[in-house]
Amino acid sequence: MSILKEIYEYKIDFVNKQKKLHTQSDILSKLKNITSHDFSFSKKLKDEMSRTSIIGELKRASPSLGNFVNEEINLSNIAQIYEECGVSCLSVLTDEKYFKGGIEDLIEIRKISTLPILRKDFIVDEYQIYES
């Protein structure tokens, strides 16, 4: 089996389990209580065309680098440092199996940062979009 097929099958199974824990209806009802902000990733990059834009990546592991893992890393602290240093946007890896992240990382970063955030994951279902 190819690695992409393996990832796809794993992610389909994982998302189906998540749907049983938190239904899409539950997620949509929570979204109604969220205050709207302008977190447009593409708009932020276009607005800063006069300077080099940097996207700060936040991840706990990297399979391409020999699968180093640092699950104890404080992503919120790193996000704050990135913001203080002037990054334009943030990218948060939320894949559990391969990058040791989670949707909780995305939620935590959103609480402390006003920058646009990209959820970086293997997206296989619209459920994940609403979850983001």
Task: Show where each model-derived region lies.
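Conserved N-terminal beta1-alpha1 strand-loop-helix module at the mouth
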Residues: 1-117
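Short beta-strand elements of ligand-binding domains
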Residues: 119-121
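Catalytic cores of alpha/beta
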Residues: 124-131
